[in-house]
Amino acid sequence: MLTSLRALPRAACRLSSINLFHGRSRQNYATEAKIPINIMEVGPRDGLQNEKGVIPVDVKVELIEKLGLAGCQLIEAGSFVSPKWVPQMAGTGEIISRMHRLPDVHYGVLVPNQKGLEGLLSVLNSYNASPDSDSTPPPSDEISIFTAATDAFTRANLNTSINESLAKLAPVAKQALDKGLRVRGYVSVAIVCPYTGQVDYKKVREVAKELLNMGCYEISLGDTVGRGTPTQVAEMLEEVKKELPVERLAGHFHDTFGTAVANVFTALEHGVRTIDSSVGGLGGCPYSPGATGNVATEDVLYALKNSKYTVIGTEYGKGTIDLDKMTEIGWWISEKLGRESISRAGRALRAKKIRDAEMVADGEVRAKL
């Protein structure tokens, strides 16, 4: 069972930078150093934003805390967007203020515009004025900004063109950087647009470069519709890498057509070292008709077992992200939402756990006969 985060002592230190390490693989990679990769857990934000029912603040807080205890060190905790348009993200300020924050975890929030940034800064100002500011990590140390690779998608999502969205984001990024925040960028519909079809990868490269020039430390390239294939992912990345360092890129894949895990491996083989994923496969996009959830964190973790890659995590996951704990969390949050986890690995691991428990119980009964 997951330990209660409330029982843990508060660490008297600030958030540390990401600590990459080299582990040793087994089996086929017994003599080679593993390649470290990061997972950005987007379940609390991208995973929940498209849910129809009301999700209590307490549940969101508990979700983020559980993820930290499972070893996640990169967590997108919410977004400062209009509750009129994305009601599930209401209360993000309260959530990041209330949650027990671990010192070696980065808690990011998405801000779509200047107003969103002002909402976050208000929370941070309250934190800085509190007596706990010297002994507890801040509510957030990172923002994400986003645009897309087609005008049709930005007009549906932001009611603006790509160029107009970039012009509005530039001062947001600058102010955030001036305040000491890290800035991450998203490029949606990097492969297929739900409104215009196949995307021009040169446009993906151009938009990603603009975000990089704004000061984004990393650009997440999204297969928002989930229609991308490994071949398309490879072609897109090769185009973007012509002008952007691959170490500044991340992959964000939805699993609409069941290709997300394959796309993750393609991205890794092309040098990408950060993958966005969502516990329980939560997710979708309100402006992308037909899109299903993000690639499940459990599926990524399971697929990477015995590979040449190692996922970086915190001490709570023993230096990685604990697959068993993530499976528990995936089922817990899915049940809170009134459904089963859609993670394939999560379903299989839970079924195995139930079977094993039944076999133990059956053995105990037979022993008493």
Language-model segments: which ranges?
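Catalytic cores and adjacent flexible loops of soluble metabolic enzymes
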Residues: 2-369
